[in-house]
């Protein structure tokens, strides 16, 4: 160990316990912030389909042109550990929509929980999730969830500790989802119309994003980037999203059929 690091370690160990805890918390927070790598989303030429991901792998030029995210980290039950099941996310956009494909691998696909249900009634099923802060202000975000059969749930997330913080499921917007269970796990496709979102009218967007997966039989939640219990707040743990250019925001006022 370098002498400077040895001296620093000795000083930390000589501190009272509460000061050591503060130093550890600061170092963890700094490490998370430093490791928070952003993604540059690809503009794609067509809407992706499950056929582009045959055998749960990007099998066409379109699929391979999308931006890939993986290496999810647990929040529950073991905060900070690697996810027990592999998840890959592929994201791209065109002039009208944001496109996302989830590949949720599972060692025991016959234990995946997936039920046909009404919109929003998906508690207890396996779930994949996308959270998007379209103003990059870490105050509020759109959230979209789907089950392995494509059953939808959407909400608005508000940051903070007030009574209004957390998910507001009164948000109802129009978007598309589909799902398919396979012998390796399941796939989910999301297509979010840009007119369903609110964002700044400027040539290039700077958003923040987070992907999640919930496996109820394992009581497991995992996320990319990590969404850790030891760090206060959620949207400050999202990743910067760049690359979306020359698109127009909508007014976010649509009628959702029942």
Question: What is the predicted function of each stretch?
Answer:
Residues 1-17:
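N-terminal secretory signal peptides that target proteins for export/translocation
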Residues 10-13, 27, 33:
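Intrinsic disorder/low-complexity segments in short proteins, especially the signal peptide
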Residues 20-30:
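Bacterial N-terminal signal peptides
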Residues 35-258:
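Structural preference for beta-rich elements and adjacent junctions enriched in aromatics
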């Amino acid at each position: 160990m370098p002498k400077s690091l040895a001296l620093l370690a000795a000083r930390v160990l000589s501190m009272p316990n509460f000061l050591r805890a503060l130093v550890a918390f600061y170092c963890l927070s700094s490490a998370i912030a430093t490791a928070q790598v952003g993604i540059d989303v690809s503009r794609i030429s067509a809407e992706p389909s499950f056929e582009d991901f045959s055998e749960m792998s990007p099998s066409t030029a379109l699929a391979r042109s999308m931006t890939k995210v993986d290496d999810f980290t647990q929040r529950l039950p073991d905060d900070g550990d690697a996810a027990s099941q592999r998840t890959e996310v592929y994201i791209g956009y065109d002039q009208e929509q944001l496109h996302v494909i989830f590949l949720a691998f599972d060692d025991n696909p016959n234990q995946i929980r997936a039920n046909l249900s009404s919109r929003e009634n998906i508690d207890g099923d396996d779930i994949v999730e996308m959270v998007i802060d379209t103003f990059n202000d870490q105050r509020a975000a759109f959230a979209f969830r789907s089950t392995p059969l494509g059953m939808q749930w959407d909400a608005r997330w508000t940051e903070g500790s007030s009574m209004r913080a957390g998910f507001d499921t009164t948000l109802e917007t129009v978007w598309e989802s589909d799902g398919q269970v396979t012998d390796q796990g399941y796939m989910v496709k999301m297509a979010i119309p840009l007119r369903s979102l609110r964002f700044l009218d400027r040539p290039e967007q700077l958003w923040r994003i987070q992907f999640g997966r919930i496996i109820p039989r394992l009581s497991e939640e995992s996320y990319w980037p990590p969404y850790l219990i030891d760090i206060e707040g959620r949207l400050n743990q999202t990743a910067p999203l760049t690359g979306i250019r020359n698109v127009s925001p909508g007014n976010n006022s649509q009628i959702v059929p029942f």
